[in-house]
């Protein structure tokens, strides 16, 4: 196992019914809560209950409901303005990855001292000019869609509508002070969102498993265990959305997949880098982009680096079966399903290169991915 240093300060309040503690827990962090979420019926009841809980706890609140998928930095900037006008001393993110990541970007933006908020973003891996935030107001997260693991990590993924780019902010000050993970909040998720979250959760761990260190029994068992848990419980939750056990397993698996436990000493996200371009340029939902890329990536690299893929096939399912599993969950498994054609591949490769290729001209992967290799993978994904 590689040497590593690990610290995660997030206090997690987990379990059915724990949402009822939101008011008292947020009151420990501040008295003016700026709630960041969507203007959507899927969270409206939760937001009403949260406002009441905060009021009972003596916390004044206001809602910022302008979050959209793949939160644009322009929206983040507006949130910063409104949070300052309100005099917020704590920010609360409620929803899936977009809401939580927007809340993180806003909470950092309020105190940001390096100009344009896009300066926070690692927008080029080959020419790193990002000035990540050094301080932020307290942030409290309440996920309603298990997927990104934002509730227990230091990352925020945002986009630029102007630049057609999607990348991340990475800073210690983005760790939430605390998060409530109540599986009951996921019961009303639409099936498509449930499936997207499950596939995104799988991808976080799969990327570490196939790219990371090859000599750790513990990490491999942990990684495969998370994937097996999601593969088992995702179809159950899709069939019966109020299955408490399945929803609980999916929620904790999503968190554990990207809070550092499964990947100490490793940081591999090449499939995500491709997915970000599919999202920013073609509007493909994040989970769908990974549903498309994963099977093609696996099929390509099994021929080059067979060991991890053969173990995946032995312990979970074959790559063709995995592709079928994703499709049966209701997600696309080919670029053509989303209107992407072979002639678009050079543009996609150029987009990935622009943001995610290192200074040595390859995508950070194990083995490294060249432009030519990426083009071949995308052809398999057609």
Predicted regions and their residues:
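Glycine/serine-rich anion-binding loops at beta->alpha junctions
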Residues: 88-104, 144-150
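C-terminal charged capping/lid subdomain of soluble metabolic enzymes
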Residues: 314-382
